Amino acid sequence: MSRYLKHFTAVGDNKSAVPTWHEEDTSHHVTTLHDAPDGLEVSTGQHLGQLSFRDSLRKLYSTERFQIVVVCLVVLDAIFVLCELLIDLSIIEADHHRIAPQVFHYLSLALLTFFMVELAGKIFAYRLEFLHHKFEVFDGIVVVVSFILDIIYISKEDAFDAMGLLILLRLWRVARIINGILVSVQNRANHRVEKLKEINESLVHQVNELKEQNTKMDQENVRLRALLKDHSIDF
C-alpha cells in the first residue's frame, strides 16, 4: 500500500519514512521538516532566533491554522464556481446585465490569485523538494492553468461562448477545487500525524526514564538487602 501512497505526499512530509511504515516504531529520532524546532531546516542548524524568510514560510505552511484557512478559501471558491456553473447552464436565471456572473467570476479570480501567491511561496520555500511531491505539483499546474484561462476569459469572453469552452473552464475549476481540498485535508492529516509522533516520542521517553528509575531502585534494593545481611539483620 505504501508503494502507492508515497506518490501522494505534500511538501514538508518526510519522504524517506513513507516506504516502510514499521520504521516509525523502531526509530524515534527521525526529524522531519515539521518536527524541526519552529520549522527550521534539519541541515541548517540555525539558532531559533535567526529564522530566515524561507524558514518562516515553511513554518507558516506547516501550521494547522493556515491549512484551515486554505480549506475555507477552497470551499468558498467551490461555491463561487458552482454559482457560475448553474448560471451558465441556465439553472439559475442571471440578471439582464449579467452582473452576478461577473461578480462571482472576479471573486473566484481573487481567490485564484491568493492560490497563485501561495504556490509561489511554496516553490520559494521548498525549491527542488517541491518537485518531489506529485500531488502538490499537480495542484500547482491546475492552479496556473485555471488562472491563465480565467484571465483569457476576462479579455475574450465572447470567444469562450462561441467555442463552447466556458463549461469546460468551469469543470476544470471544479477539478482544481477537488484537488485543492484533497491537498489541504492531506496536509492537515500529516500535521496531526506529526503531532501524534511527537506525543509518542515523549511517552516513549517517559517510559524509558521510568524503566531507568526502576532499575536503579532494584539495584538499591539489592544493595540494601546485602547490607542488612552483612549485619545479620533479619527482615
From Swiss-Prot:
**Extracellular-side segments:** 87-103, 156-162
Q: What residues form the membrane-spanning segments?
A: 66-86, 104-126, 135-155, 163-183
Report the Pfam families cross-referenced here: Ion_trans (PF00520)
List each coiled-coil range: 187-231
Give the InterPro entries listed for this entry: Hvcn1, Ion_trans_dom, Volt_channel_dom_sf
Q: Which family does it belong to?
A: Belongs to the hydrogen channel family.
GO MF assignments: voltage-gated proton channel activity; zinc ion binding
| Entry comment, domain topic | The segment S4 is probably the voltage-sensor and is characterized by a series of positively charged amino acids at every third position. Unlike other voltage-gated ion channels it lacks the pore domain.
Q: State the source organism's domain of life.
A: Eukaryota
What do we know about how this protein assembles, alone or with others?
Homodimer.
Its biological function? Mediates the voltage-dependent proton permeability of excitable membranes. Forms a proton-selective channel through which protons may pass in accordance with their electrochemical gradient.
Q: Kindly list the biological process annotations in GO that this record carries.
A: cellular response to pH; cellular response to zinc ion; proton transmembrane transport; response to zinc ion
Name used for this protein in its record: Voltage-gated hydrogen channel 1
Q: Which residues lie on this side of the membrane: Cytoplasmic?
A: 1-65, 127-134, 184-235
**Per UniProt, which keywords does this protein have?**
Cell membrane, Coiled coil, Ion channel, Ion transport, Membrane, Transmembrane, Transmembrane helix, Transport, Voltage-gated channel
**Which PANTHER family is this protein grouped with?**
F20B24.22, VOLTAGE-GATED HYDROGEN CHANNEL 1
What membrane topology does this protein have? Multi-pass membrane protein
Q: Name one GO cellular component term.
A: monoatomic ion channel complex
